[in-house]
């Protein structure tokens, strides 16, 4: 019975992370639209972040399917870990580099918190934990890059 409960919890954690990655994709798609034409470098960076989240989603979804469960393809409005990215998307009011980057950083903070919370689940199998730690490391690097760029335009 404990194994089934652990599997259920693992599936829930993975699906929540799929949803936060969906939020991240949606957020960066919005950021691309809100970014001025002359800020092509930011558009390329945001496209890279979108690709990163797609890779994360594929890896997470593969594990969910391997466990015989259905993949949650929504966003965190129906999830449990963090809904912050949706709030971030709603506050895109300015189109200057600093504002766009500041909003992206807030979204990255939400993703960081989601992965931190996910890794607090002690019942995660070691191979899942290893995958999440790797994804978390990539997200940390992305966060730091966004923050560094934001600070340049403060």
Residue spans for each PLM region:
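Amphipathic alpha-helical hairpins
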Residues: 2-154
């Amino acid at each position: 019975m404990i194994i089934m409960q652990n599997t259920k919890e693992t599936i829930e954690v993975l699906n929540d992370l799929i949803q936060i990655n969906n939020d991240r994709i949606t957020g960066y798609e919005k950021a691309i639209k809100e970014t001025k034409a002359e800020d092509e470098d930011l558009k390329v960076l945001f496209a890279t972040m979108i690709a990163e989240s797609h890779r994360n989603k594929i890896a997470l979804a593969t594990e969910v399917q391997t466990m015989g469960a259905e993949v949650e393809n929504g966003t965190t409005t129906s999830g449990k870990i963090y809904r912050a990215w949706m709030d971030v998307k709603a506050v895109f009011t300015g189109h200057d580099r600093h504002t766009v980057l500041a909003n992206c950083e807030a979204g990255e903070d939400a993703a960081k918190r989601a992965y931190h919370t996910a890794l607090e689940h002690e019942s995660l199998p070691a191979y899942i934990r290893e995958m999440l730690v790797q994804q978390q490391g990539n997200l940390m690097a992305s966060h730091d890059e966004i923050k560094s760029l934001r600070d340049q335009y403060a």
